[in-house]
Amino acid sequence: MKKLLFSLSLALVAFLASSCSDDKRDAIGRTEIVIETSRGNITARLYDDTPIHRDNFIKMIEEGVYDNLIWNRIVPGVTIQTGEPTQKAGGAAPTVDASKFRHTLPAEIKFPRHFHKAGALAMCRQPDDVNPDRVSSGTHFYIVSGKKYDLGSLAEVWQGRRDDEPGFKLPSLSAYQKKVYTTKGGAPLLDGDYTIFGEVVDGMGVVESINKVPIDAEEHPLKEVVVKRIRIVKR
C-alpha cells in the first residue's frame, strides 16, 4: 500500500510540474455564429486554423441543415450534441435531402492548442476501431458543458488514459490547460480524439441548461430541446 501511495504521489508531482514549453492560447477566428435554441442563444467563434471544418460548418448553416433540429444526445457533465438532418422538432419531415449530407471531413486535431474546455465546439465521429484516421462527421457536432476538476483528479484522468488507451501519446497538460480545467471545467477525456473547430463566447448558461435535461438510458433527452436555426453574424 505504501509503495502504491508513493507511486501515485510521484505521478501527481510530475503532473503538477509539467507544462508545455509553447503554451499557446486558442486563436479565436473572425467567423461568429449564433445558435438559436428553444432555451436561448449560444454565440460561438470558429477557429481559423481548422479551415476545412470551419468552411464546412458555414456551408451546412447556409444549406439550412441545422434548421429546426433537436438536440439528440446529452452526456451529463460532458456534452450536448445535435446535427442529424432527419431529426426535426416534433417529428417533422426533413427539409433537406439527408443523403447529401453523409460526408466526412479529414481530421484537423490541434491538441494541445485546442482542448476540451467548457464551451469547446467540435465535430462528432465514428470510433477508432472503424475510423482509425479520426475523420469527422460532416454535420453532427457537440458543445462541451464539462465539469471542474481538481489537480489530483486531472492527474488520475491523464494517467488512466495512458494505462487504458493503446498508443496514447498526448503530452502532459500545460499549466494553462490545468488552470482552465480547474477553474472553468471541461472534458479532458476527449482531448486529442476529436477536431475542435470553435468555442462558445456567450451563452454557456444555455449550454449548461440543455445539459441538465433528463435523459433515457441511451442519453436521448426526455424533453425536446430545439435548434431553431444557426445564423452567421460575422465573418
Task: Give the residues covered by each predicted segment.
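Bacterial N-terminal signal peptides that target proteins for export
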Residues: 1-8
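Repetitive helical segments and hydrophobic/amphipathic motifs
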Residues: 11-12
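Cyclophilin-like peptidyl-prolyl cis-trans isomerases
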Residues: 7, 18-235
